[in-house]
């Protein structure tokens, strides 16, 4: 039996495209997302809170919601 996904995959794709389009350097953006997801994963492990959303997807959603993702802007 398939489990229901608690988030919309189309929204994550849209958000990731929004992040990529706003970045002047995709490598730096990719590293920021990966590092933040890695931190979230370890925080989740330490607090024993296990989310059904993978850390990378949660990080993309958080970065778009923060409105601080524009640190790496196009000029």
Curated annotation (Swiss-Prot):
Enumerate the catalysed reactions. Answer: RNA(n) + a ribonucleoside 5'-triphosphate = RNA(n+1) + diphosphate
The lineage, from the top, is: Eukaryota, Viridiplantae, Streptophyta, Mesostigmatophyceae, Mesostigmatales
The UniProt GO MF terms for this protein read: DNA binding; DNA-directed RNA polymerase activity
Annotated family: Belongs to the RNA polymerase subunit omega family.
EC no. given is: 2.7.7.6
A GO biological-process term:
DNA-templated transcription
What does the UniProt function comment say about this protein? May be involved in RNA polymerase activity.
Lineage, top-rank taxon, reads Eukaryota
Q: Can you cite an annotated GO cellular component?
A: mitochondrion
UniProt source species: Mesostigma viride (Green alga)
Top class in the EC scheme? transferase
Cellular localization per UniProt: Plastid, Chloroplast
- Name of the gene: rpoZ
Protein name listed in UniProt: Putative DNA-directed RNA polymerase subunit omega
- SUPFAM superfamilies attached to this UniProt entry: RPB6/omega subunit-like
Name the UniProt key words of this record, in alphabetical order.
Chloroplast, DNA-directed RNA polymerase, Nucleotidyltransferase, Plastid, Transcription, Transferase
First and last residue of the signal peptide: none
């Amino acid at each position: 039996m398939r489990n229901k996904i608690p988030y919309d995959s189309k929204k994550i794709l849209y958000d990731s495209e929004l992040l990529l389009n706003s970045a002047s350097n995709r490598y730096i953006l990719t590293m920021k997302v990966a590092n933040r997801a890695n931190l979230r994963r370890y925080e989740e492990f330490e607090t024993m809170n296990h989310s059904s959303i993978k850390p990378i997807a949660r990080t993309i959603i958080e970065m778009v919601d923060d409105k601080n993702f524009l640190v790496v802007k196009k000029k």
